[in-house]
Regions:
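A compositional/biophysical signature of low hydrophobicity enriched in polar/charged and small residues
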Residues: 1-100
Length: 100
């Protein structure tokens, strides 16, 4: 599994629409609204670097109105309390979950 962390700047009036659109992209597992230099942190979990590139370069920046800028990092190692590959198995989590 390849994990990308995208820091995203969004037009303020488009924040909710951008968040909803991002959650519909295959491979996007979480979207966090944050304070600071960026507006959103987007977690992307895919099977290859080329798939990550497609999500960031095409689906995020070209297909979603309101996104001004992205900066993407690739995780070199993940340490977690759960098996992330099993947790994010697409067959088990096909629809985005919203937690209040």
């Amino acid at each position: 599994m390849v994990t990308g962390i995208a820091l995203v700047t969004v037009e303020r009036k488009m924040l909710r629409q951008a968040t909803d659109a991002l959650l519909k992209i295959q491979g996007v597992t979480e979207v966090y609204t944050v304070a600071g230099e960026y507006d959103l942190v987007v977690m992307i979990r895919v099977t290859s670097n080329s798939e990550l590139s497609d999500v960031v370069a095409n689906k995020m920046t070209h297909d979603i109105p309101g996104i001004i800028h992205t900066r993407t990092m690739i995780s070199l190692q993940a340490d977690a309390k759960v098996d992330l590959c099993q947790f994010y198995d697409s067959s088990k989590h096909s629809e985005p979950k919203v937690f209040a």
